[in-house]
């Protein structure tokens, strides 16, 4: 993709009720200085969906990205996304996971050029006995980069949500700013949320933080 793309690029992945498995592989490359909006839409009836997305964002390029997963309750969605960000590039990503009996969104991002700016937001909504998994690996390979991960979850009935997130800072990635926060809200005593934020830092001049909260609605506040 070269230059500025004025209209969103939408990739729609749909499946029928034949119970088949699909394994689409998509590669996207933004040239230096390019800008685009990319959206994935996943909606399958029955079966396994295991998409693989590889994205390369060139120097001083910008990508706004969204992924919506709303497969049926009789399906499994196991997705992997890999991104490489060039020098001075900007990535704004948003993921939403609401469908599937089992859903896992795994995202690996490498900030391979200095002054790259990356924001990844995700939300999962679970009910019945759904299982949602958001896994991220943010790798700072060069210095003066910024990353921010914002994860939100809402769980009802016997649903379970899992967030596993890592920020890795290489020895040469000085002046890194890596932030990570996960918050989950439980609407049922049977719902469960697990969070495992991690920092792996090999540089000494960085600003990194992570945190996680899990809570219920206050009955008094609901009453009033």
Model-identified regions with their sequence ranges:
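Conserved beta-strand/loop scaffold segments within soluble protein domains that form the structured core
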Residues: 1-223
């Amino acid at each position: 993709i070269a230059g500025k793309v004025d209209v969103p690029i939408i990739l729609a992945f749909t499946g029928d009720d034949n119970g088949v498995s699909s394994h689409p592989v998509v590669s996207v490359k933004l040239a230096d200085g390019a800008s685009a909006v990319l959206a994935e839409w996943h909606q399958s009836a029955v079966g396994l969906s295991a998409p693989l997305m590889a994205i390369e964002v060139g120097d001083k390029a910008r990508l706004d990205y969204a992924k919506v997963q709303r497969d049926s309750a009789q399906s499994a969605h196991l997705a992997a996304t890999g991104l490489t960000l060039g020098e001075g590039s900007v990535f704004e990503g948003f993921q939403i996971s609401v469908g599937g009996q089992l859903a896992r969104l795994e995202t690996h991002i490498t900030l391979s050029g200095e002054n790259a700016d990356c924001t990844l937001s995700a939300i999962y909504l679970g009910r019945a006995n759904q299982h949602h998994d958001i896994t991220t690996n943010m790798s700072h390979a060069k210095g003066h980069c910024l990353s921010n991960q914002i994860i939100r979850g809402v769980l009802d009935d016997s649903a379970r949500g899992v967030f596993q997130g890592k920020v890795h800072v290489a020895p040469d990635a000085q002046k890194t700013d890596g932030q990570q926060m996960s918050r989950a809200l439980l609407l049922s005593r049977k719902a469960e949320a697990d969070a495992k934020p991690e920092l792996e830092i090999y540089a000494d001049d960085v600003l990194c933080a992570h945190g996680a909260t899990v809570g219920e609605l206050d009955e008094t506040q609901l009453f009033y």
